[in-house]
């Protein structure tokens, strides 16, 4: 579960920007008890949040910041700032501006982690990982690394045994230190990498142009799950099934409908309406939220979820909560 995300100096954002899913206290919390979930770590977290803003107000750049952070975990390339992602004003004011990304989340091992990295055009300036078991409990620093004036990385704080090995031959900034520690067997680093790669989905609408065979296989597994069809058919209740195309599922899949006389007919997804095609893709992400406890950021979701469809999705989710609340972690 995502708790908080902060960043600065990214695209249109010059100053620090913070996004928090902590539920507010007071009367608002009491009025909407179904809008948040209580965790064993002492956090009350919102289940959903809506980012509202005018056109060109920075909503997409906000999500792109998360995409960029996630991409640093995906590759073993040199980690450094890219001029096209640095705020234009800062780029003119500073010779080597720094960008900070900070994320706090509840991982699958039920620990709270705070991960932060600061990067510039030279590479990683600093990187740290902190673990805690409760919202107000003492923090345990896994590692806190800083690049000094001689471009040498040093450990400021931390108890991870694997840090010494990770620091060797690491002055080229290839790959994040947290990824290196995960490869060396550090459990806290592994939990962080696992969450970033397999739990966080920042606004990527699935498509046939997916760049990972593994991710496409995961999408196919979801589409072939009967529960996925229950979500997808909310866009049109005449839909009664699908025949998934394994090579191009987002365009060549056949949508099966049944008319009032009970007769079935099929249509290729690419020939269907824009609304049906887009909801077919977003239904995969809705499935991940409902059944796999993923954290999904959806950009321009209002293109897909009109008021009627929104009510259907919410009613579907609430029905699952009421049925399985005693046994299911929300």
Predicted segment positions?
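Conserved P-loop NTP-binding catalytic core
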Residues: 42-44, 49-50, 54, 64-121
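Conserved ABC ATPase signature
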Residues: 48-51, 250-287, 291, 295-308
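Single conserved hydrophobic/aromatic residue that forms the stacking wall/gate
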Residues: 321-330
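Pre-Walker A-like glycine/lysine-rich segment at the N-terminus of P-loop NTPase domains
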Residues: 2-68
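Electropositive, glycine-dotted interaction segments
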Residues: 114-244
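Glycine-centered tight beta-turn/hairpin loop motif at sheet-sheet or coil-to-beta transitions
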Residues: 12, 108-112, 260-262
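Long, charged, glycine-rich C-terminal linkers/tails
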Residues: 84-86, 240-251
């Amino acid at each position: 579960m995502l708790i908080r995300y902060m960043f600065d100096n990214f695209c249109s954002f010059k100053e620090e920007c913070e996004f928090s899913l902590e539920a507010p206290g007071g009367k608002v919390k009491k009025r909407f008890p179904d809008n948040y979930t209580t965790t064993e770590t002492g956090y009350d977290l919102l289940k959903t949040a809506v980012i509202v803003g005018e056109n060109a107000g920075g909503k997409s750049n906000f999500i792109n910041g998360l995409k960029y952070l996630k991409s640093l975990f995906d590759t073993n390339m040199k980690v450094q700032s890219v001029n096209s992602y640095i705020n234009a004003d800062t780029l003119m004011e500073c010779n080597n501006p720094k960008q900070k990304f900070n994320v706090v989340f509840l991982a699958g091992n039920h620990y709270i982690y705070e991960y932060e990295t600061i990067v510039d055009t030279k590479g990683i300036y600093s990187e740290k990982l902190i673990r805690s078991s409760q919202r107000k409990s003492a923090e345990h620093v896994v590692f806190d690394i800083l690049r000094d004036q001689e471009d040498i990385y040093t450990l400021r704080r931390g108890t991870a045994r694997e840090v010494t090995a990770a620091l060797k031959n690491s002055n080229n900034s290839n790959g994040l230190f947290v990824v290196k520690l995960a490869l060396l067997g550090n459990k806290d680093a592994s939990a962080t990498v696992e969450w970033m790669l397999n739990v966080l989905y920042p606004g990527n609408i699935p498509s046939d142009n997916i760049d990972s065979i593994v991710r496409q296989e995961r999408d196919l597994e979801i589409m072939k799950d009967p529960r996925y069809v229950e979500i997808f058919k909310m866009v049109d209740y005449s839909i009664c099934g699908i025949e998934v195309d394994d090579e191009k599922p987002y365009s060549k899949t056949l949508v099966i409908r049944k008319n009032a006389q009970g007769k079935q007919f099929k249509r290729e997804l690419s020939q269907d309406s824009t609304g049906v095609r887009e909801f077919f893709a977003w239904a995969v992400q809705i499935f991940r939220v409902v059944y796999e406890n993923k954290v999904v950021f959806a950009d321009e979701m209002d293109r897909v979820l009109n008021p009627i469809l929104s009510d259907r999705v919410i009613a579907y989710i609430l029905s699952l909560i009421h049925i399985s609340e005693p046994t299911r972690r929300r």
